[in-house]
Amino acid sequence: MSDLEKIRLKRLAKLQQTNSEANSSKEPKESNIAPEPKKPDLKKRFIGSKATTSNSEQKEISPPVTSGAPKHRLFSKDEWMHFITCQALNITLSETDSSKYYLEGFKKDLEEEGSPLLFNENNVDSALLSRLSTTGNNTFSYLLQSWSFLYQYKKRLPKDENQDFKIHYLSLLKSLLVSYAGIVVMLPDTFNSETIDLAEVLIGAEGIPLEFLSEFVQRFEHENLDELFIPVLESLSLKIGLMNVDTVQMNVMQIILQLVSLKPIALLLPKLPSWNPTNNAGEIEYKTFLGRISSLSVFTQDVASRYFSNSTERSAQNISSSISSLKLTMSTYQDVLFQIFNTLIRTSTSLRESVLDFFAMVVNANHKRQSIQVNHFDITSDACMLNFSHVLSRLSEPFLDIGCSKIDRVQVEYFRRNPRVDIKEETKLNADQKASESFYSKPAEGSNNFISDIFFLNLAFHHYGVNATFKALEQLVQSIRDSEKLKERLETEQQNMSGSFQATRLTAQLSRLDQRLDLDRSFVHCYEIMLTQTSDTSRSFSFLNFVAIWLSRLADGQSSTYPKMPLSLPFNENAPEAFKCLPEYFIETITDYMLSLFKTSSSTLTLHSLEPLCEFCVSFLTQANYIKNPYLRAKLAEILYFGVQTHVGRSELLLDVVRTSKVATRWLLPALMAFYIEIESTGQSTQFYDKFNIRFYICEVFRTIWKQPAYFGKLEQEQKTNLPFFVKFVALMLNDATYLLDEALLKLTEIHNLQSLLADAISNSNSNQNVQESQSNLAAAERQASTYCQLGNETIFMLKLFTSSIPKAFCAVEIVDRLAAMLNYNLQALCGPKCSNLKVEDPTKYHFNAKTLLSIIFDVYLNLCNEPAFVEAVAHDGRSYSKEIFERATSIMTKHNLKSSFDIEAIKEFVNRVEAFRLQEATEEEDMGDIPDYFLDPLMFTIMKDPVVLPRSGISIDRSTIKAHLLSDATDPFNRTPLTLDDVTPNDTLREEINTFLKSKRNKHSRNSE
């Protein structure tokens, strides 16, 4: 028989005796029923109590002296026990003491037994039973307040020779009160008490002292504790799950924290029906205990509307104040949430494993969060995932010290030892599914440690939680832009349909659109609250910086001690299998998060060292053997771009590192050039257009570092070290400039024509359909023109920089003709007879400035004008070169003071040399007479100087021509089969024949001249 049952039977027997006595005696007077004991003034140890007492308000609690006792008389032990029992239990054996409850029946029992009329350790149990028979529905409250009095009295007990005795008796009384409190809660019918909802008592105004709860749990640890507290934990978690940041009762979270701080209660959690009942991602925050308490959110329509509705009309101060207030609430909540998880993890090994299993279940069930389109009912919410990420980032902090002293505790073999994080279906860095499965099918010895679990779980939550939320924000912002454009179009249509039925319909549609726009804009601020909390962004940066160092260390080899010692670059050509088989998101999580910080100019970036991030970008930018996906490595270039740019209110965050880092100053320039070449072909259908965006970032980084002393002379060094590599780079840059400027000028001409067409249509009142079609075409042309102009400007500026540094490199036979043709063509477009077609309304809208572009093109001419090969190349361009165009261009330059008189004279001298060479060539060509067709290059139609035979087509072509072709296209130009320069063979016979022909013509010319 359990203790509870014994006490229950004892109580029933006592009640029977009491009832029989009551039948033969009169009812006690109402005046004898004392009021409930006054609640002691406790400090802050009540779970759920909303009241706090300042130090100035605290008063020492001392037991009041009964009216019959002398004020200064010392108590004997028996008297003291009687006194303290009366005070604590609010009972008395004196009929005249109206301040306490008179135990008349109990007094008679003592008299019949001949016992002293004093409460003591032998009879206090019975006395308490007698008192409890009268408390009714207030039984639990009575027991709790009595215990609280004893707790406070014991804390202030003065030291004397009877201290141990007093402590023993006080503990006995407290133990009795706790035991009977358990009976009241578990067996309320024993005292005719109402059923106690312990959860409601905990969150009530008075709450329950933590020490009482601790003793309660200790007393009943082995007696149905789960039946009592499992419903409490479930109830409290459900309450949190129904709250948002505007309605949250933080005391409920505090209660849960206090409960789980008691080990027996914490160990009950895995027994909860809601502990881990589902692996459905959409149900986690509703059906699981940890999901419910982690679901507090600002992402509700109520919160968004209350704080941020009509945001365009609110003051910036008002919005900022709301954001700060909600951030504070979320910060307070997340702090308690972390304490709960931290407590659980430290409670026991088994509970820690259960919590880690839960985290793993959540992240493995949420892979769809990174999908382009997803049903939000199939995934866990942004708020819940961000709260989980917050907890894991806090758990990661102990191993994120500045010196990375614990980095070797992150186990490379983690995914070969029954990992919690599922990466089976993830795209790997440089391994296909078969290779990956083969690698991971070979288990590693040992077991995974806690640091590794937290490391890989946190990384996965940053990918599927934090970064997926940033992506959701980007989609929301894009949706707002689309809605704003739609609104503009509908408003235009409404004006054109004024007074018609369609206008009324459009009015209703616009009203709905305004409501949606207002809500969407409000939610943007909600995202700002969750994603820009400085403490969170700082933790995430530190963690992902640590991940970048860990990856660099892994690539550097087993003997690497990075970051204590520098990286050994370039990395080994053969990447470790452990690296190649890691998921792509290990890199992507770093790049995407860092880009989010750079794009928003987060203040977090100023709080940390950026050197590891810079070195990470430089080290892996060209490492295709380590990171196969070029688009993933392109994000490294994008980080460098945003890092060296000037941001609003903040200087170039990465520039200092780029200037001083030994890794950057040695490897950045060649890495940018190599990646510029590599991105020419990505294997994707969109590669032709993708490369321009990526190269824009590269050009901007070039442009920035060009001015830095640490990079002076680096370009010349690269050209001397590997000339073929450099020529390939220059050729691709030239291709880009040719295409982009050509497309930009074509689109500007199209815009010019469409703007003229629209002006005529409006003045002639043409049909709305024609106007709308023209407006649509104009909008498309404007978008394209803006892109082409911006990209073209950067590329031509790069040509200006590079030609100023190493002009001879641009006069290589493979590229000089194309460079001259490109410059001449654009000069003609800007200054020729059709230049008026480039006049558009607000050209700055498209990043187009004709004078600036003309000046840059002239700079390239000036940089190369003293190179004979360039003079010849310009003279050979019979399609675009014109002396008159140069004269018109110099006139424009002079008129607008775009160039100095010295530069103008240099250009005129250059044109004179070109004209002289053209005259000389014309004379020589006339002397040549008829030239056999097979002496002519099949592509350039000039006499071949060094003919070679293409292996598969068998066609002879000049070596310089095929070299130029192969710089941008590694195929035979006549049958598109793969081709390299090593495949061609010299056509010595044809070369000798051509040389003989030329010699004979020269001899004939000499004789005629004589």
Swiss-Prot record:
CDD domains for this protein: RING-Ubox_UBE4A
One Pfam family name from the record?
Answer: U-box
Which keywords does UniProt give here?
Answer: Cytoplasm, Nucleus, Transferase, Ubl conjugation pathway
Please state the Enzyme Commission number of this protein: 2.3.2.-
Main subcellular localisation: cytoplasm
Record's comment describing the protein's domains:
The U-box domain is required for the ubiquitin protein ligase activity.
Described purpose of this protein according to its UniProt entry: E4 ubiquitin chain-elongation enzyme specifically involved in polyubiquitin chain assembly. Binds to cdc48 and elongates mono- and diubiquitinated ERAD substrates presented by the ufd1-npl4-cdc48 (UNC) AAA ATPase complex to a chain length of 4 to 6 ubiquitin moieties. Delivers these polyubiquitinated substrates to downstream ERAD components, which target them to the proteasome. Enhances ubiquitination at 'Lys-48', but not at 'Lys-29' of the Ub moiety.
UniProt protein name: Ubiquitin conjugation factor E4
Organism this protein belongs to:
Schizosaccharomyces pombe (strain 972 / ATCC 24843)
Q: Which gene encodes it?
A: ufd2
